[in-house]
Design a protein with these regions (language model features):
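Left-handed beta-helix
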Residues: 1-70, 220-447
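Conserved N-terminal catalytic core of the sugar/cofactor nucleotidyltransferase
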Residues: 1-73, 84-91, 95-207, 396, ...
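Conserved short loop/turn motifs at secondary-structure junctions
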Residues: 9, 122-131, 213-216, 331-335, ...
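Beta-strand elements within well-structured catalytic alpha/beta cores of enzymes
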Residues: 74-78, 209-211
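Conserved adenylation A10 loop of the ANL superfamily
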Residues: 78-84
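Short His-Asn-centered micro-motif
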Residues: 96, 125-129, 154, 211-213, ...
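Conserved core of the sugar-phosphate nucleotidyltransferase
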Residues: 133-279, 283-289
Length: 447
């Protein structure tokens, strides 16, 4: 009740946000964030996770395709900042390739789709209070494009002080640090609260494709799930549980089963967070307040104060939709850029850029991408760019490990397994045009 009273007095947020927050906290306190009963988990069958190649092909007829696409809306989750990569502002404005940002590529893709089929697929961006102002300025540059861009904000919830369970903003924390965006599970109520859902339904739109703005593989094609590789061991997976399909995230796994959860044998698929959802169903479920997704408690510290933020994931909503299925899609549908090592992949000759689509180079024989580990010297985008005169050729690379003060000249070719480790205090420069194949380099003498 103290929390309820304190929240009621917060002037910065709407009544919808207040009631949404209070109901999330009530669910959390009633023990709904409980972990799952491990023995009840079953691997989903092909009926609920459908193999991609068994899907019916889209109609050949252009008019039929146009009619389908005219019912579609693309929604990108744009609430994240580029802080982990050393950038201020929205992550979607990091330059990915040829000077284009994530957002540029998304706009170019939808433009070419609209042009090709004569359709009008709009783009929605769900911002957070962290990215809203910057995004509003950035989208102005697309005002001449053939694409309608709508933005709306996801909810802004107060962080809870762990000690006395009161909102941080009512304890004198006036800045942004007092608040948090409650995860992308919030996309459904926020789409409704913003009025955008009703607008889209009134325009005859029927489906929304939801994806992370940093997943370059999330182009308009068809919830998708892809074969798990070792890089994805922490990602959520789809399971059958008490007769329904649901998303299982690592936060819900009992400690003694975490290693089993990470195993590629038992859980072969993971959630790409590419979701295809019926807009009318969203409206019906949001109005009925039926979307009670699993709560993920995320403990943080703000200026030495321990706080709690309660979050939900969009994919977890799958169990509230009747007849929901997963689709096991090719790896190409999941090309996320979470770190500069991913940036190295997408800026290299492993990919080309066509109509805003990042497409894999057919010259790459192996189906999987090389594994890349870069040391902390490469963590920030600016430092990463400064250490490469040009991005090396990695079409024949299996793995690369770089540590220490290393920089690369132009036209470098890396093949097989390459490890480069500069000793402390030593600056190691890989010369222009160097070809390194299955090499261990610890100093200039090894080049």
């Amino acid at each position: 009740d103290n929390l309820r009273d304190a929240v009621a007095k917060l002037g910065e947020i709407s009544e919808n946000e207040k009631s949404g927050f209070i109901s999330l906290v009530s669910r959390y306190l009633s023990g709904e964030a409980e972990q799952i009963e491990w023995s009840k988990i079953q691997t989903p069958t092909d009926e609920v996770v459908v193999p991609y190649d068994t899907l019916a092909p889209p109609p050949e007829d252009l008019d039929a395709m146009k009619a389908l696409l005219d019912k579609l809306v693309v929604l990108k989750l744009n609430g994240g900042l580029g802080t982990t990569m050393g950038c201020t502002g929205p992550k979607s404005v990091i330059e990915v390739r040829n000077g284009f940002t994530f957002l540029d590529l998304i706009v170019i893709q939808i433009e070419s789709l609209n042009k090709k089929y004569g359709c009008s697929v709009p783009l929605l961006l769900m911002n957070s209070f962290n990215t809203h102002d910057d995004t509003q300025k950035i989208v102005e540059k697309y005002s001449n494009s053939n694409i309608e861009i709508h933005t709306f904000n996801q909810s802004q919830y107060p962080r809870i002080v762990t000690e006395d369970f009161l909102p941080l903003p009512s304890k004198g924390q006036t800045g942004k640090d007092g608040w948090y965006p409650p995860g992308h599970g919030d996309v459904f109520p926020s789409l409704n609260n913003s009025g955008k859902l009703d607008t889209l339904l009134s325009q005859g739109k029927e489906y929304v494709f939801v994806a992370n703005s940093d997943n370059l593989g999330a182009i308009v094609d068809i919830m998708e799930v892809t074969p798990k590789t070792l890089a994805d061991v922490k990602g959520g997976t789809l399971i059958s549980y008490e007769g329904r399909v649901q998303l299982l995230e690592i936060a819900q796994v009992p400690d003694e089963h975490v290693n089993e959860f990470k195993s590629i044998e038992k859980f072969k698929i993971f959630n790409t967070n590419n979701l295809w959802v019926n807009l009318k169903a969203i409206k019906r479920l949001v109005d009925a307040e039926a979307l009670k997704m699993e709560i993920i408690p995320n403990p943080k510290e703000v200026d030495g104060v321990k706080v709690l933020q309660l979050e939900t994931a969009a994919g977890a909503a799958i169990r509230f939709f009747e007849k929901a299925i997963g689709i096991n899609v090719p790896r190409s549908r999941f090309l996320p850029v979470k770190a500069t090592s991913d940036l190295l992949l997408v800026q290299s000759d492993l990919y080309t850029l066509v109509d805003g689509y990042v497409i894999r180079n057919p010259a790459r024989v192996k189906p999987s991408n090389p594994s890349i580990e870069l040391g902390p010297e490469f963590k920030k985008v600016a430092n990463f760019l400064a250490r490469f005169k040009s991005i090396p050729s990695i079409v024949e690379l299996d793995s690369l490990k770089v540590s220490g003060d290393v920089s690369f000249g132009s036209g470098v070719v890396l093949k097989g397994n390459v490890t480069i480790a500069a000793k402390a205090g030593v600056k190691l420069e890989i010369p222009d045009g160097a070809v390194l194949e299955n090499k261990d380099i610890n100093g200039p003498e090894d080049l």
